[in-house]
Swiss-Prot record:
Keywords: ATP-binding, Cytoplasm, Kinase, Nucleotide-binding, Transferase. This is Cytidylate kinase. Its EC number is 2.7.4.25. It comes from Thermococcus kodakarensis (strain ATCC BAA-918 / JCM 12380 / KOD1) (Pyrococcus kodakaraensis (strain KOD1)). Coiled coil: none annotated. It comes from the Archaea.
Amino acid sequence: MPKGCLVITVSGLAGSGTTTLCRNLAKHYGFKHIYAGLIFRQMAKEMGMTLEEFQKYVELHPEIDREIDRRQIEAAKECNVVIEGRLAGWMVKNADLKIWLDAPIMERAKRVAKREGISVEEAFVKIAEREKQNRKRYLNLYGIDIEDKSIYDLIINTAHWGPDGVFAIVKAAIDHLSPSGDAGEDEKEKEVG
């Protein structure tokens, strides 16, 4: 692992494996895990709302999104953190490594169904509706299109690998991360020098 202070963001849609990866990274490297989804869920619970009800409430109260995002940006000032959130890669502009996890919606629906003890069909509908609402909200609030993956350093389709395989890919990326952030420049210096 590169020496110094690392800030890694992990983003992805529901059921893509972001929490599993972040927990594995935190355990292996001793990173602090900042989880925007947990903050969101806790706020829903505090207000006595289901996740779906809170999702609709947040659409009318953008200050909630801004508070979650502020906490992510603040956390990025720490060393050796992994920040998990759909917009983490967008919010933490100076992250050393920005990761997007993806999987086909049916695969993600199966995972969510298993996790939440609901049918795959119900999970599919919930995910599709939530993603539609989130995309609209992020566009309106920040001008961010969640489907734009151009800011990410590493994009992994988690349908192809289990949690251990995804972790191995990300571990390799972290362990070989260029300290300057531009591996091409390091290579040029080696060639010239």
